[in-house]
Amino acid sequence: MAQDIVMVVGLGNPGSDYENTRHNAGALFVEALAREAGQTLRPEKKYHGLYARIQWQGLDLHLLNPSTFMNRSGTAIKALADFFKISPEQILVAHDELDLPPGTAKLKKGGGHGGHNGLRDTIAHLGTNDFQRLRLGIGHPGDSRKVTGFVLGRLGKQETEQLTAVFDEVMRVLPDAASGKLAAAMNRLHSFKPTP
């Protein structure tokens, strides 16, 4: 049976300055998925990022964390998609989401970029917004002037625990989401409640 999701991309910024920051939630998810499958992401120049191919839960998935900066993510995503002839609708892009509380996640198909530079560049390079998104909640600082410092700030202990819990839940629903049962996966994931 054809897979609905063939490629999972984690948006983030490269380098130790950005490790474990809220803005790197997507990249942290893809690292966790690779670990779950017993694989390690390795540098791959032709895809401008860290790459692994995994066989997991009956799925054959290409994992990519672009090593470009966030606002150039589309370069890496397009390079990998073009090489393996993966269509945009078969791509799941995991990214941090200010408009969701920490420890929650939502699956979404299509839509705008909502001011997220990684999504903006992905849409520009793919020439469409018709790809799937995994929105990982990081919360909002409450003041739009504080957003940059907030997203580039490091995750606290409780936030890390909440992200780990939601990553586990995403991994439970991903096989359904990738194999034609997106509605069921969304229902389960969207009803997941973070630990207080």
Swiss-Prot record:
Q: Which residues bind tRNA?
A: 18, 69, 71, 117
Q: Where exactly is the site Stabilizes the basic form of H active site to accept a proton?
A: 96
The record ties this protein, via InterPro entries, to:
Pept_tRNA_hydro, Pept_tRNA_hydro_CS, Pept_tRNA_hydro_sf
Q: Pfam families in the record, alphabetically?
A: Pept_tRNA_hydro (PF01195)
Active site residues of this protein: 23
> One GO molecular-function annotation for this sequence?
peptidyl-tRNA hydrolase activity
Give compartment(s).
Cytoplasm
One Gene Ontology cellular component = cytoplasm
| Known catalytic reactions | an N-acyl-L-alpha-aminoacyl-tRNA + H2O = an N-acyl-L-amino acid + a tRNA + H(+)
One example of a Gene Ontology biological process annotation: protein quality control for misfolded or incompletely synthesized proteins
Domain of life of the source: Bacteria
Q: What is its EC number?
A: 3.1.1.29
What does the UniProt keyword field contain?
Cytoplasm, Hydrolase, RNA-binding, tRNA-binding
Family indicated by similarity: Belongs to the PTH family.
Subunit info here reads:
Monomer.
> What's this protein's function?
Hydrolyzes ribosome-free peptidyl-tRNAs (with 1 or more amino acids incorporated), which drop off the ribosome during protein synthesis, or as a result of ribosome stalling.
Name of the molecule in the record: Peptidyl-tRNA hydrolase
The taxonomic lineage of its organism, from the top, reads: Bacteria, Pseudomonadati, Pseudomonadota, Gammaproteobacteria, Pseudomonadales
- Quick one: which gene encodes this? pth
